[in-house]
């Protein structure tokens, strides 16, 4: 990764911070894109303590604000001639329905719309042999998970946090697979792939539900080790998708087990591979964000 530029969203904690650490350790310049400059700088300082001389610029970006995403994209254009790797890692889960500054349901705005907009706005910066990686979740394949285009904001459905989160993570996969189809159609060699971390012992996973919270209790750590893994291990699927020279567009990586293990190829739910749904979501995402993709061969 020496000499390459990577952008990691949500790099101020958990899997994002660990992903940035590993990329920096292998010589990449890593842009830490996060809401809090202070938290980002703290992560950068911690990485530099382990990787002296690491190049870790911190970029403020609130994915729930399209204006913030546009400003961050403009700063990337000003500061870098190219981006080799974009890892759309950041994610949130809100327990009570709220809306973003743009009026969209917060989880969907952050997890999907912000990343859709960012990727489109920096597409011209991405190197021909570059990678775009979407970090999804096992929740994308739950039986209850759907993408309801007529009600993406859960205004007319019961607001169940895991259903809301699952929809946003399924949207991540629909987006990245449709992106790969459009890249291939344009004749570009840029690769779009996806990953999920399993169940990593990060602060975020403790918010996913009662089971995850229970497994995070100190008294149950010996039991939790049977089904969870460290953030170091949880970052490996994303890192493989971003750096393995053998990765092909549209591939999806996750742990060997359902929740833990080294990264291997997985097949997502059939819904995630639905090209018609993906195309309709793409059209709706362009309408909601005002970002229209322009592909170059």
Q: PLM features: residue spans?
A:
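Rossmann-fold NAD(P)H-dependent dehydrogenase/reductase core
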Residues: 1-211, 288-296
């Amino acid at each position: 990764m020496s000499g390459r530029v990577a952008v990691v969203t949500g790099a101020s904690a958990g899997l994002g911070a660990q992903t940035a650490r590993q990329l920096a350790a292998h010589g990449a310049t890593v842009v830490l894109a996060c809401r809090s400059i202070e938290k980002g700088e703290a992560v950068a300082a911690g990485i530099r303590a382990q990787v002296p001389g690491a190049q870790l610029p911190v970029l403020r970006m609130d994915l729930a604000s399209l204006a913030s995403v546009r400003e961050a994209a403009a700063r990337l254009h000003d500061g870098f001639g190219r981006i080799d790797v974009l890892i759309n890692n950041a994610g949130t889960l809100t327990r009570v329905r709220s809306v973003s500054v743009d009026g969209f349901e917060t989880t969907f705005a952050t997890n999907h719309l912000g990343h859709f907009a960012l990727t489109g706005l920096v597409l011209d910066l991405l190197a021909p042999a570059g990678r775009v990686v979407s970090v999804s979740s096992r929740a994308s394949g739950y039986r209850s998970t759907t993408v309801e285009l007529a009600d993406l904001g859960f205004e007319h459905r019961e607001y169940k946090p895991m259903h809301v989160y699952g929809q946003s993570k399924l949207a991540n996969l629909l987006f990245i697979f449709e992106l790969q189809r459009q890249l291939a159609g344009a004749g570009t060699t840029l690769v779009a792939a996806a990953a999920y971390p399993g169940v990593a012992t990060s602060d975020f996973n403790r918010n996913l539900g009662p089971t995850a919270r229970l497994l995070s209790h100190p008294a149950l750590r010996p039991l939790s080790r049977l089904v969870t893994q460290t953030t170091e291990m949880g970052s490996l699927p994303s890192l493989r998708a971003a750096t393995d020279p053998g990765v092909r567009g549209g591939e999806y990586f996750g742990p060997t087990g359902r929740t833990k293990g080294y990264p291997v190829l997985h097949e997502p739910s059939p819904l995630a591979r639905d090209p018609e749904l993906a195309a309709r979501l793409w059209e709706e995402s362009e309408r909601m964000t005002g970002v229209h993709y322009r592909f170059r061969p």
